[in-house]
Design a protein with these regions (language model features):
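Short amphipathic helical patch at the helix-1/turn junction of helix-turn-helix
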Residues: 98, 132-133
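Conserved beta-strand edge residues that scaffold enzyme active sites
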Residues: 133-134, 156
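Helix-turn-helix
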Residues: 138
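Conserved active-site tyrosine of GNAT-family acetyltransferases
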Residues: 142, 147
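Conserved G/P- and acidic residue-centered "switch" motifs that form tight phosphate/ATP-binding loops
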Residues: 106-108
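Acetyl-CoA-dependent GNAT
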Residues: 8-12, 19-95, 99-101, 112-113, ...
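Conserved GNAT acetyl-CoA-binding A-motif
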Residues: 119-132
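Extreme N-terminal starter segment of soluble prokaryotic enzymes
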Residues: 2-5
Length: 160
């Protein structure tokens, strides 16, 4: 899969972001999270009105640096990420999801690099991520990129 690029999400991307996040949660956490916690997670993270509102928030607010989308050939969205710098010096990855057919092709890494660049621009010296489950399937991805456990569900890496 060839990655066309990473860009800031536009209003027309909201439905795709919502669907991709919900599908990723369902497929990644089946058998890890019980049905009710999974529904709550999807309801909290993937609600279309929430994502539409977040896309409309102008960039430049450190706590929320916006949604990014990765596109494949033809402009199809194949991955999404969101982050911010909620505490001075600490970047936070709020979401990162990649279409199953685009995984292991550098899409997640490209999204994380773009989000990290934004966070550095707002003074982040450390980057954190919190997982919905201790046995999160994304742990190897984050470990490969230099993250280490602060607690079973919270990981961090220095940004040098």
């Amino acid at each position: 899969m060839q990655l066309a690029g990473v860009r800031t999400a536009a209003a027309g991307d909201a439905t795709t972001i919502s669907r991709l996040l919900a599908d990723t949660i369902r497929s990644s956490y089946a058998g890890i999270l019980d049905e009710i916690p999974m529904r709550r997670l999807i309801s909290a993270q993937c609600a279309l009105p929430r994502i539409r509102a977040e896309i409309e928030i102008p960039g430049g607010a450190p706590g929320w640096l916006g949604w990014l989308v990765a596109t494949g050939p033809g402009g199809t969205v194949v991955g999404v990420a969101a982050g911010g710098v909620p505490v001075p010096g600490e970047g936070e990855v709020y979401a990162l999801a990649v279409e199953p057919g685009a995984r292991r092709a550098g899409v997640g890494t490209a999204l994380l690099v773009a989000a990290t660049d934004r966070m550095r621009g707002y003074g982040a010296r450390e980057q954190r991520v919190e997982f919905p489950a201790e046995a999160d399937p994304a742990l190897p991805f984050y470990a490969h990129l230099g993250f280490a456990a602060l607690s079973p569900r919270r990981w961090s890496r220095p940004l040098v």
